[in-house]
Each structure stands twice: as C-alpha cells, then as structure tokens.
Regions:
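Conserved N-terminal beta-strand and adjoining loop/helix that marks the start
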Residues: 1-17, 38
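Short, glycine/serine-rich, charged loops/turns that create anion-binding
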Residues: 14, 22, 71
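Short N-terminal binding/cap micro-motifs at the start of the first secondary-structure element
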Residues: 16-17, 24-27
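A positional/architectural concept
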Residues: 29-32
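Unchanged
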Residues: 39-62, 72-126, 148-161
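Catalytic phosphate/metal-binding cores of nucleic-acid and nucleotide-processing enzymes, i.e., regions
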Residues: 68
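Short, active-site-adjacent segments that bind or coordinate small-molecule cofactors and metal centers
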Residues: 129-147
Length: 161
C-alpha cells in the first residue's frame, strides 16, 4: 500500500483543482483531483503535502490542516493510504503543472465534474471546518464505489453522492 497526500487549497469559495490530462496510464486520467502525490523516503504527511503542493503548483503553504485519512482499495489499482489536507493560507504564483491543468473551481461545482465517487464523500465532510479528523475506507470495483466505511462503520454512501 502506498502513502500519498491530497490537499484542497481554498480561496474565495473555490478549490484549486487539477484536471489530470497529461499522463498516460494514470488512475486519475481525465479526473479532477486536489493537489498531491506520493511520499518520499522518511517524509511525514505534512512534509509530503507541502512539497507536493509546491512542486505541482508553485504555491507555498503557510498553514495546512490535516483533515482525514482515506484508505483507497481497488480491484485494479494499487491500494493507497491518502492523507487529506485543506489549506487557506498560502503564497506564491501558480505555475504550469506537468500533470494537468490547474483551475480554481467553485466548491459547489466540483460535484458535477468527473471526480472519484468517494471524493464526494470526504469533500462534503471537510467542508465543515469543525468536523473532527476521520478515517474513511473506500472500496472500488473498477471506477465504481462499492462500499464505504466512516471511522470503521459501514455507511450508506449512496445518500452522499
């Protein structure tokens, strides 16, 4: 299982999203995702998050909030432990990203874009800044979400999609 980070950078009611269109054989190809990537040797989640955000966007985070851990289980892709952050305090100029197109998207419009079904669940939970840290397990068959557990308990995720 690989460890990754995912950061949702917010400004003026919008998230900076990455439309993954430049890499072939990418499990996120043509999907809209937050900013992130794989851990390097001996990195903490916070260090990986800051590095990945800078590498992909050119932005430096002054503060990021560690919001949840998502266990991504798939029948076709490598399992992943995704450390999810949000950030509102940052500086720098956005640069071109070699993985796709960076776009500020209204938070309410994200749900109509091609995103992973499970992302809709954790995005709704992290919209509440006071929602406590949580663990979310998402199991997929292909690109179809087939089960979800919040803090170890199965949830009826279809209500949240």
């Amino acid at each position: 299982m690989r460890n990754t980070t995912l950061c949702h950078i917010e400004k003026d009611g919008k998230y900076l999203m990455l439309h993954r269109i430049k890499k072939k054989n990418d499990l996120n190809h043509d999907k809209w995702v937050g900013i992130g990537g794989k851990f390097e040797e001996c990195e903490s989640p916070e260090q990986c998050n800051a590095r990945e955000v800078y590498e992909e966007t050119g932005l430096t985070l002054n503060d990021a909030k560690y919001r949840c851990v998502v266990t991504f289980v798939s029948d076709i892709w490598e399992s992943e432990l995704i450390h999810v952050f949000t950030a509102k305090d940052f500086f720098g100029d956005i640069k071109e990203c070699d993985e796709g197109e960076l776009v500020w998207i209204n938070k309410s419009d994200i749900y109509s874009l091609p995103i992973w079904e499970g992302d809709k669940i954790f995005l709704k939970l992290i919209e509440d800044e006071n929602y406590p840290f949580f663990s979310l397990r998402l199991q997929y068959k292909g690109e179809k979400l087939i089960s979800a557990e919040l803090n170890g308990k199965k949830i009826d995720f279809k209500e949240l999609l």
